[in-house]
Amino acid sequence: ITTLQTYKEWKWEHLNNDDWHIETPICLDESILGYDDLSYAIEYGLIDVLNIKVGRMGGLVPTKAAINLCRECHIPYWVGSMVESGISKMLHAQLAALGDSYMAGDLSDSNRYFERDLIYPDLTFKDGVMHVPDGDGLGVTVFDDRLEAYCVEKRTL
């Protein structure tokens, strides 16, 4: 699998595997910024595999729509993550645990980047295996005091 990063739309016409004369599946990552990008890439045969990230897709609802489109069009997907808090890591872990990912995600322990993360229990890997809690919501408790301490801007709806 070859992962292409930040391949702008104006270059997408160069992505067709037939033109490259390679058999390696093309995985798009940062190039897919939402459902419309994914739909375009599928329609024009520019994608073999998708690396999906909730934040890049625009939230959980568009991510769900993208996963459903991948399933309908038989495009394998896998779940990636970035430097992010345990809340986002747990969301990505829950998505990766759906069971039909193409391959293991590039997830890491939730306490990897922050000395005091926002969730309990931490998302951890033991011997390469991720334990995903099955409680309500994401299955973890959010430390409200830590969230408040890290908050830069707050909006009340």
Residue ranges and their predicted role:
Residues I1-S88, F114:
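Catalytic core of soluble alpha/beta enzymes
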Residues V83-L157:
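Flexible C-terminal active-site loop/helix
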